Amino acid sequence: MKTIASASLPKNVQMPQYDRQRLTSRIVHFGFGAFHRAHQALLTNRVLNTQGGNWGICEISLFSGDRLMSQLREQDHLYTVLEKGADGNQPIVIGAVNECLNATLDSLAAIIEKFCEPQVAIVSLTITEKGYCIDPSTGSLDVTNPRIIHDLQSPDEPHSAPGIIVEALHRRRERGLPPFTVLSCDNIPDNGHVVKNAILGMAQKRSPELATWIQQQVSFPGTMVDRIVPAATDESLEEIAQALGIADPCGISCEPFIQWVIEDNFVAGRPQWETAGVQMVDDVLPWEQMKLRMLNGSHSFLAYLGYLAGFQHISDCMQDNAFREAAYRLMMTEQAPTLHITNVDLNQYAESLLQRFANPALKHKTWQIAMDGSQKLPQRMLEGIRIHLSRQSDWPLLALGVAGWMRYVSGIDDAGAAIDVRDPLRDKIRALVELSSLSERVSALLSLREIFAPDLVQNPQFVEAIEQAWQNIAQYGAHQAVMQTLKNSQFLPFSGTKRTFVLSALLFLSFFRQDC
């Protein structure tokens, strides 16, 4: 059977421009998901195209993804990224992956030994918040997690990502091999420290001596990742097949924009990612906060309220004047003043985000973005709210976003249709929803300490603002609530250069007030 590895592809398809036979597994990556395929692997492919080298990627999946891995092997570890822009699509065949391992197809033993090979310099991860096995209330290793319990009892046969990495580092140390860099590429705040806490927490439970060695020898760079990559669908895979003239079950579609900011702290070398446009910096935090609050915060706002209002895709929300204006104002009047970043035009950044959101080719579903909200709400909205509370400044759209999440997880949209809520806390949330009336819903959901810390729950201003926003959605529906909030909140009736000037002045004053 022909695959993209053996078929003759159209001339407009970008193919690998390097000798794939030279590749070795210098990067071992947990999580062959959509985002990794269209982001880290693609940027590594770019480096190989221009610089050559042997920085191959071995893809790892543990207890799922065996079918995808089988399909990847059948096409010589090649797959397609279809960049979809307003001016057309660009298919790119990625060749940076040189092998893959799966616990079902291969074995856990084979996976662990792969990490112990001498050439491995980087272990990277896209495993979502859940994969790090961190207790969100403490930021420490969750020792009640079933996989962590198993790994502590059977450390040489681990089932979790932290357990596997610690066991691999233990074996490398015993064999006199150098350590590797652990690189989180997940879209979570302070991801370098998150994975470091997970690894050191696991190592400390096993052996304080091992934990000390890891602390001294292993680096955990922070990263900021940005690219809109919707989950693959039958429709997107068919579009890729049309572009190639042959099916690619591992293919993925995404927007043209891509950004990766990395703390330049690697103990065993790295690809020359900067030649592919990656920003290597000393401190990732300002970039991370900008992206989490302005992009992800407005994305979540549109996802919850847009879904409730009947919008299937983010681009549909952008066709609505009220939702578009709300997203812009949320970014510039509520989120931007909470940031500490220099040499970045935040108004230009916000305008570029609106253009990206409006891309109709992506078909990024509001339902997909609304998933796992309990894990996302704190960094995307609640941190900004804390800053506003401390400054006594206004945050009506952030309040509406939080209330929108509460309405969404209550399980019924504005048309009365049931919502398929996907969240790690779904059972807890469902129990609270079922035991509370609509008038009690806010106080019930605020009891979720995994999301809402005491400093917020005990703040009357916070509770009152969320209650009012909830009542607006419950009474008027999400769309009308957005319009009402825009009408009632302070706004700037300007456009173009004048709006940019006024917003810049407001940002300057907010920073000045904070410094005072």
Enumerate the language-model features and the residues they cover:
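Positively charged N-terminal leader segments that act as targeting/secretion signals
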Residues: 493-506
